[in-house]
A protein has these predicted regions:
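AAA+/SF3 P-loop NTPase mechanochemical coupling elements
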Residues: 210-215, 249-268
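N-terminal nucleic-acid engagement/recognition segments and initiation subdomains in replication
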Residues: 1-125, 144, 377-380, 388, ...
Length: 430
């Protein structure tokens, strides 16, 4: 680079050292004071900011190369500072830029959302988004409640974008449906810039690499949630989802610090018929499933949608958490997505669930074990299986007296050989 500008008007440095020699006063090489670096950046039209979404320092403007790495930008900046007689090492340049960036934080997500709020047309646009989701008719789910889950999750997304460390997400929206129906595409319909989100992420809360990676995005899709919800990760994941802050070491900082959580999660799962992805009913209030068969490619004014959500979140102060009544609805909904135990599968396969109700009988778990030739040692497991099925099937009533719990249970299936419609094999050629 041409060490130019030596003949231009001298800069009026804020901090200088004076040296008196032979009766004359003169300035020696300019010291690397923070004030001098800030002054030089202003003179060179170079902008330094800290991006709260990506967690990165941005160095732009002046004669710096565009789209270059921060390390390259620091090298170029130091060269320009040296050309203007600023005495500074590369380490000192890093320190100064980091300090200046910390004084100028910004969030591109927040800037976008403020603009959406400013230009909102005053109409509710949640229906426009909800219409993209074709609900699965085979799953018992209330349409209005599904829409409530979607809107409250969106409200949490904008609240966390502006989070100062006092807000926590309350749920992960989970789209349940077959592969190839556009579940991941739904995420990117929400984002004005695709690099604000990430998809197909498997999250292990105990992995520093996993948590560091997802912190750099606004909305993260947890692909194939069943893998993320592995049993050994469940407790850690429940705690992680609702954290208000994250431990993070900013670029080139010497120590880690607590920073506000600004990331929300959406999940996708390819749930097969008769399968589930939730491993137990306790603690599942953090998972908000909507079962769908397709994501439709209908028009959506994304900016107006976020303008409406901003209004709901900050003007109407609408909550992003579920009420007690809504939590009860969620428990009923989640019961349909439980991963079946061995005992549940046995009951579902062995009992005739299509039998008329007048053929059902009140039985204890012990009675059921006896009829199905199950060891009495498994009474408790069978009892829990009956309770889980009862949460999904209201016919399996669970009245109880002071001594035992009885269930209204269907009769056993007739063995195949006893079916009156079975065609006998003659053993002779037709």
């Amino acid at each position: 680079m041409n060490r130019a500008d030596n003949n231009t008007t001298p800069w009026n440095w804020p901090v200088v050292d004076l040296d008196i020699r032979h009766g004359q006063q003169r300035t020696i090489p300019i010291p690397s004071a923070l004030e001098n670096v800030e002054y030089a950046l202003n003179q060179l039209n170079i902008r330094v900011r800290y991006n709260q979404m990506t967690k990165e320092i941005e160095l732009t403007g002046g004669n710096l190369l565009t789209n270059a790495s921060l390390d390259v930008g620091i090298t170029q900046l130091r060269s320009q500072l040296t050309a203007h007689h600023l005495r500074i090492s590369k380490t000192e340049t890093w320190d100064a830029v980091s300090a200046i960036a910390a004084k100028h934080p910004y969030s591109p997500v927040c800037e976008y959302l403020r603009e959406c709020r400013k230009n909102w047309d005053g109409k509710a646009h949640i229906d426009d988004l909800f219409c993209l989701l074709k609900l699965d008719p085979k799953v018992q789910q209330n349409t209005d409640f599904c829409k409530t889950l979607l809107e409250k999750w969106l409200i949490s997304a904008v609240r966390l974008a502006f989070n100062k460390g006092d807000i926590a997400a309350q749920g992960v929206l989970i789209l349940v449906g077959p592969q190839g129906i556009g579940k991941t595409r739904f995420l990117y319909r929400l984002l004005p810039h695709s690099d604000w989100g990430a998809d197909g992420i498997t999250l292990d809360p105990g992995s520093r690499d996993d948590t560091m990676r997802i912190m750099r995005f606004w909305i993260v899709e947890l692909g194939e949630v069943g893998n993320t919800l592995r049993k050994e990760r469940m407790d850690a994941l429940k705690q992680y989802i609702t954290q208000k802050q994250d431990v993070f070491r900013k670029p080139y900082a010497r120590s880690a610090e607590m920073i506000p959580r600004r990331t929300v999660f959406i999940g996708t799962v390819n749930e097969l018929p008769g399968e589930g992805f939730l491993r137990d009913l306790t603690g599942n209030r953090r998972y908000w499933p909507i079962a769908i068969t397709q994501v439709l490619n209908l028009p959506l004014d994304r900016d107006q949608l976020w303008g409406y959500i901003m209004n709901r979140a900050f003007d109407c102060q609408a909550p992003h958490y579920l009420s007690v009544a809504e939590l009860a609805q969620l428990e009923s909904l989640n019961a349909q997505h439980l991963l079946l135990t061995t005992e549940e599968r046995l009951l579902l396969d062995s009992l005739n669930w299509n039998a008329p109700l007048d053929q059902w009988h009140r039985m204890t778990a012990t009675d059921v074990c006896g009829d199905l030739c199950i060891s009495p040692q498994n009474n408790r497991k069978v009892g829990r299986a009956l309770q889980n099925i009862a949460r999904r099937d209201s016919r399996l009533k669970t009245p109880s007296n002071h001594h035992q719990r009885e269930y209204l249970v269907p009769p056993m299936k007739a063995p195949a050989w006893a079916s009156p419609d079975r065609t006998e094999e003659s053993g002779t050629a037709p």
